[in-house]
Regions:
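Internal alpha-helical transmembrane segments of multipass membrane proteins
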Residues: 22-24, 265-286, 324, 329, ...
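Mechanotransmission and gating elements of multispan inner-membrane complexes involved in transport
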Residues: 170-268
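Short helix-loop junctions at transmembrane helix boundaries
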Residues: 313, 328-374, 388
């Protein structure tokens, strides 16, 4: 009985009911799409950071990232590398050496961060090889090959095949070490800092120049499970943070990205609160308008003995009917929008720098089951809560006053 009356009362003024359903439904659709888009944006940023160069995590000597002292190579480097390479949670690990130095061409001298890498292993964990725009990638058999960024090449006035001189101080002794290299490749990683200040050579040559033997300054690793990327296991990081070494996840290495992801979550919460407030006011407004149009009707119902609880339930049911059709509309529109944009991809933000990283691929919204369960349930709860006041008002109607014709 209550269901039939509630449904009929909603259809009594179809235009108002349709407008209210559209407000609630399109609001729900916007919320579903925004949630999926932000999940896709966050995943895109994480992938851009971890797959480009940083990896899912890194191991260094304590304070190395702050001081960049050549002497601060990883303690027991080879054993640590072997141990993490065999760890069941680790998909891949590669070593690197890092040194600050100067690079000189016939036209200019500039400071650089020089990385020594194993060319074969490095291409499995970073996008250096895929970022080569001119020339070729490093060959482990050629010790004088050099990779530099396109902006650095422009500053130095060099191109493929040109020779440059790199100078650095050796570990322990501080004696200057100078070597001539040939530019074999020019990369563009779409990051201003990397493209203007990084250079790569073969790791064996870098160890020789730095005078650090078989040691290295950095071990970059990737997790096997995607869940570990989003929530790095603290036990694993603690395991490799021994003997004056330090294992850090990408969240600690690039805190701006992690903060940005948290900020997008807070933004979604604030947006959701505002949206649900609008939905609540719209529902309350619709129910009150319907209530005042039917004051005479409710007065008659009270006069013939209808209980206040019945009228209270009737108004609540009307709100539930509105929420039901609004949820169907919101789920349909939000789902279609998410599926279409996931298939097409949002490429307008490609190559845009955000929080220190560059969005390199099209953003694809990521749908989840919670978007289609939690948000519709929230719509129902909001509709029910916002209908309580109109329902109480209707239940307390005094027949003699409501039936009066002035």
């Amino acid at each position: 009985m209550i269901k039939k009356l509630g449904f009929r009362n909603i259809l009594r003024n179809r235009r108002r009911s349709i407008i209210t359903c559209m407000i609630m439904g399109l609001g729900l659709a916007a919320l579903i799409f925004a949630d999926a888009f932000l999940h896709g944006l966050n995943q895109n940023m994480i992938t851009s950071v971890t797959d480009s160069f940083i990896g899912d995590g890194q191991i260094h000597r304590k304070d190395f990232l702050r001081t960049r002292e050549l002497e601060k190579s990883i303690n027991d480097s080879e054993n640590v590398f072997k141990k993490i390479s065999e760890d069941p949670k680790i998909k891949l690990a590669v070593p690197r050496t890092i040194a600050n130095g100067m690079i000189a061409s016939p036209t200019d001298v500039l400071p650089i961060a020089l990385y020594g890498i194993n060319a074969i292993e490095e291409e499995k964990i970073s996008s250096i090889k895929n970022s080569i725009k001119l020339g070729s990638y490093l060959d482990n058999s050629d010790p004088i090959q050099l990779l530099i960024g396109d902006k650095l090449a422009k500053f130095l006035g060099v191109t493929i095949g040109d020779k440059v001189v790199i100078t650095m101080a050796q570990a322990q002794t501080g004696i200057l070490s100078q070597e001539m290299f040939r530019v074999s490749g020019i990369f563009k990683m779409k990051n201003k800092e990397m493209d203007s200040s990084l250079a790569f050579i073969n790791i064996n040559k870098s160890q020789e120049m730095m005078g650090i033997g078989n040691n290295f300054h950095e071990i970059v690793f990737k997790f096997k499970n995607k869940s570990d990327v989003l929530n790095p296991p603290s036990e694993l990081l603690k395991l490799y943070s021994e003997n004056d070494n330090e294992a850090l996840s990408w969240k600690k290495l690039v805190p701006a990205i992690d903060a940005g992801i948290q900020l997008t979550s807070y933004s979604l919460y604030i947006g959701s609160f505002i949206l649900f407030a609008i939905i609540a006011l719209s529902t309350m407004n619709t129910l009150f308008m319907s209530l005042y149009e039917r004051m005479y009707e409710f007065g008659i119902m009270k006069a013939i003995g209808t209980r206040p609880l019945f009228i209270f339930k009737l108004i609540i049911m009307e709100a539930c009917v509105l929420a039901f059709f609004s949820s169907l509309l919101g789920i349909s529109v939000g789902g279609i929008a998410t599926i279409v944009t996931k298939w097409i991809g949002i490429s307008h933000l490609t190559d845009v720098e955000y929080l220190g990283t560059t969005i390199k691929t099209a953003i694809r919204p990521i749908p989840s089951l919670t978007q289609y369960i939690v948000y519709p349930i929230a719509i129902f709860i909001t509709a029910i809560l916002s209908s309580i006041y109109p329902a109480i008002t209707a239940a307390r109607i005094i027949p003699s006053k409501s039936m009066r014709r002035d």
